[in-house]
Amino acid sequence: MCLSLVGSEMCIRDRYNFGPCLSPTNAFHILQGLETLPLRMQRHMDNTRALLDFLTTHEDVAWVRHPDLPDHPGHDIAKRLMPRGAGSIIAFGVKGGREAGRAFIEAVELSSHLANVGDAKTLVIHPASTTHSHIDADAMKAGGLSDDMIRLSVGLEDVADIKADFESGFKAARRAAAE
């Protein structure tokens, strides 16, 4: 409020565009994080590639979407613009539909059930039964979402542990699909 009464137009515009000054503590934490960013991103991408291989060949997976996969519509662009990998977000479908997807999410223990992305820990969510459960089937389909879709944000854990966690999820999904 004070800025709008006494500040210059340029000062107001800068404050609007860039926000207030960082506190020294926040600046310190950002600098600390930047020191290890390349290492963390490399681990994210290594884990993502390993999980893409795992998911694309898994018998309980109906489909996998990620720009690093050759059948993705944006593959050529992603390969050109992001030669080290197109990020650690994967979407895949669990065979068995909505209930199988929900069972998968409820069975995993290492992976956190959160809607966030880009964390150090692996995050999974079943949009059809959580964030998009209030949307009708036609609107979900129009938005590119399906009942079997799991959104995965790959974390930094040991990839063997993530795979073992997912196997527990797939086992639960098979049981749910059989019911």
Please place each PLM-identified region on the residue numbering.
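Short, well-ordered beta-strand elements within core beta-sheets of diverse protein domains
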Residues: 29-39, 88-95, 151-155
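Conserved small-domain helix->loop->beta segment predominantly found in fold-type I
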Residues: 49-116, 121, 135-141
